[in-house]
Amino acid sequence: LQRPFESDGFGLLADEAAALELSARLLRFTFRRHDNGYRRRRIDEAADILNSEFARPLTIAEIARRVGLNECYLKRYFKAQTGETVAGRLRRLRLEHALALIESGSTVQAAMHFCGYRHAGRFNEAFRRHYGFLPSDAKKC
């Protein structure tokens, strides 16, 4: 990449700069492709944790640590990949399982505790917002 007719040395510097820029672009492209696969696997892993451990008192910080992402990236990429927020997915899973338990004969209190809720007021409010009726009304249906 040397320019033999330029004696000031700047031609060589310009060529080296162009080569470095090309190398940087290739590396960014390579890592971006790898990074997307890495992130996709991390988000799938986070979804698996939510699906299997929804009844535990999970935090976004704990999930992020376990999958190797920081909290902001986890929240951003989870929403982009799944269409749901991490907290929204956790709430939906808990409430769906609670409804199934109540409909199969469990008490509201047992379903609430099994699905990770510790306070009846919060459970009732989340349930009502999600389904449009209270958990006690689900038993009557």
Located regions from the model:
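An amphipathic alpha-helical interaction segment
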Residues: 1-41, 45
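Flexible coil/turn residues that form the inter-helical turn or adjacent wing/linker of helix-turn-helix
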Residues: 8, 56, 104-105, 116
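Short helix-to-turn junction characteristic of helix-turn-helix DNA-binding domains
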Residues: 50-53, 101-105
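Basic/polar phosphate-binding segments, predominantly the helix-turn-helix DNA-binding elements
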Residues: 25-29, 45, 49-93, 112-137
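Hydrophobic alpha-helical connector segments
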Residues: 107-110
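Short, basic/aromatic-rich helical patch in the C-terminal catalytic core of site-specific tyrosine
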Residues: 98
